[in-house]
Swiss-Prot record:
It holds the Pfam family Ribosomal_L13. CDD domains: Ribosomal_L13. GO terms for cellular component: cytosolic large ribosomal subunit. It comes from Aliarcobacter butzleri (strain RM4018). Keywords: Ribonucleoprotein, Ribosomal protein. Belongs to the universal ribosomal protein uL13 family. The keyword Lipid biosynthesis does not apply. GO terms for molecular function: mRNA binding; structural constituent of ribosome. This is Large ribosomal subunit protein uL13. GO terms for biological process: negative regulation of translation; translation. Part of the 50S ribosomal subunit. It comes from the Bacteria.
Amino acid sequence: MKFTQMAHANEIKRDWIVVDATDKVFGRIITEVATILRGKNKPCFTPNVDCGDFVVIINASKAKFSGKKLESKNYFTHSGYFGSTKTHKMSEMFEKNPEKLYKLATRGMLPKTTLGKEMLKKLKVYAGSEHPHTAQIKG
């Protein structure tokens, strides 16, 4: 009788995947990236093991948005002090720091556990086409 093989953390082989965000819809990029970071595209996927790959997003500032999200969507921050709630429009965040916007959106699609935080560390986002990870990427 055969049993299901479970992946172990020391057996996982991680690849580096480059995603070019030029003229792609923001949400579709994020769902693709979250699937790769989680490892759900691999046959050895195990929910309690971080079996995802590293993802490098380049040209992050050239993505498109569907609908009127840039004007209508707001992000809230709070420092912990009374009355310190701040609201930022998505368009402001995308102009100032697109890397943070990608990380926030991807974090929302990953598990809210320590495993999810480890998965998010494997995401590298760059606004331009240059990145320092060319040595790790094959092909």
